[in-house]
Amino acid sequence: MLDLHSLPSPLRFLSLVALLAAALSLLGAPPTMAQQAAEGVVQSEAGRPAAPGRTGLPLPRFVTLRADEVNLRTGPGTRYPIDWVYRRRGLPVEIVDEFDTWRRIRDWQGTEGWVHQSMVQGQRGILVTGKRHALRRRPEPNAPGVALVDAGVVGVLQRCQVDWCEVTLDSFTGWLPRDAFYGLYPGEAVE
């Protein structure tokens, strides 16, 4: 048996460190980054995914919520707590990151969190913002109105021209100025 007292001080210290490391590995110390990588779960030091799996779709991108209730979680998995519950099918959100089957989304207020991929769909939607707007029959400021639309109304984005977009809100279809709603990037073309 090795007598640690007979070793010089630096070697004694290294021997103690090696023994401590071996003991911790036997006690089930938390997995290292290398162990997590081997299991396909790489996380940064902040606990967020460091190497998310990519679908090949552009990031960020707009999508809509698929269900009437969608749990927004603090991380990509059911083990993470629910931070917020959206209760608005068709609400437009941005996907800003992806990890496995989870999508990090951002809403119109800048709130971010994780939802399962099954809770979003590729259909483009809008959320009317600001004040009351006239939904127009044509993409012109003086065109006849189809309906008056209040802030908070959710609809479907059909297509866009330079300054106007055609949208469907319930049973009404018409044109709104691009700056009247959330759900579209500046200069983005939608056909």
What kind of region is each of these model predictions?
Residues 1-11:
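N-terminal secretory signal peptides that target proteins for export/translocation
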Residues 6, 26-27, 56:
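Generic N-terminal simple sequence motifs
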Residues 10, 14-17, 86:
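Alpha-helical transmembrane segments
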Residues 14-26:
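Bacterial N-terminal signal peptides
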Residues 29-34:
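Sec/Tat signal peptide C-region and signal peptidase I cleavage site
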Residues 35-74, 85-89, 96-99, 103-111, ...:
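SH3-family beta-barrel domains
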